[in-house]
Amino acid sequence: YGGGAGMVLSIEPMARCIRSLSEKTTYDEVIYMTPDGKRLDQGICNQLSLKGNLLIICGHYKGIDQRIRDLFVTMEISIGDYVLSGGELAAAVLVDSVCRLIPGVMNDETSALTDTFQDGLLSPPVYTRPEDFEGHKVPEILTSGNLKKIEQWRQDQAYERTRERRPDLLDD
């Protein structure tokens, strides 16, 4: 109803599907991926990783019937200020960013806890072997063995990188 360009996913099959799934499983959140949702950030990912079951609804075309949103959806999430053909890619981004925070998903669980944005900063530069590649050397501090100084260097580099590339993260 209301006219306008594009098709809208019909309410009846969507409602049947959601109700059928909800009879089998209790969902902590029913999430709709939409450009007009709250922008996904690390805080949302952290919160969702603590939930048990999530049901993610992906729109297509012009979206879904508003009544689905009103009746079933508990959270609306956007991955950015742009439009995709459907919500499937956005849902994949959400699933990947949340799952990696669940204990046992990654081999090194501390890796996810030290990622960019976990402490509000971008990650510092990282290096691999060899120590010298075509005249480009790993910073000397990283080969010093002084763990306290290395950690301070990493913090300083993370802050500086954030200040240069994403100063908006420091304004909060």
Each predicted region: which residue ranges?
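Short conserved micro-motifs on helix faces and helix-strand junctions that flank
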Residues: 1, 56, 78, 142-143, ...
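Short, His- and charge-rich active-site/binding loops that engage polyanionic ligands
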Residues: 1-7
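Conserved RecA-like P-loop NTPase ATPase core
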Residues: 4, 59, 146
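S-adenosyl-L-methionine/SAH cofactor-binding core of RNA-modifying enzymes
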Residues: 9-60
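Short hydrophobic alpha-helical segments that form membrane-spanning helices or hydrophobic packing faces
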Residues: 11-12, 66-67, 94-95, 152-154
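Structured adenosyl-cofactor binding patch, chiefly the S-adenosyl-L-methionine
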Residues: 64, 68-115
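Internal, active-site/partner-interface "lid" segment
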Residues: 89, 101-140
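SAM-dependent methyltransferases
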Residues: 130-172
